[in-house]
Amino acid sequence: MDSVTRFAMAQREVGLAIGEPPAQKGYTPSVFAELPRLMERTGLSDVGSITAFYTVLVDGDDFNEPIADAVRGILDGHIVLSRELAHKNHYPAIDISNSVSRLMNDICEIEHKAAASQARDIIATFKEAEDLINIGAYERGSNIKIDKSIEYIDKVNSYLKQGVNEKSSFEDNINNLKNM
């Protein structure tokens, strides 16, 4: 399958052709009925498991458009790619602040979750204060959390970048995250 978005657009055309009324942004009700059936084919069963990576193309970076919103409600997590990060030559251009895993609590050790939470907090705090920092309006010492984010944001961003030919093991990544 090319993308969930194109699947939804094709299903919308089928729905409209058989007389279904358009609902959210022109998508017919059958689109939203088919999405869970399509996506829930993957996962764990008594004879094995299937892992899938679905892509959703969003119009104008609107992550609340109907298909993206429906898919987020169905899947156990989502990875958001950011044009802004790509423009900064930050690859992979994964937007950690907007990406979510509902399974992380079930599959990660306590120290791993704590380190990941700290990194997410540094990113979120820096992002909130970035405009003030960039124009020189933020005065160091006025907010401990922002000071910490300024101190660690380059380390976090460096950790999140990976060269095309760079290799690292899962264990190395976790240790580097914990030691940051």
Feature names for model-found ranges:
Residues 1-180:
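P-loop NTPase catalytic core
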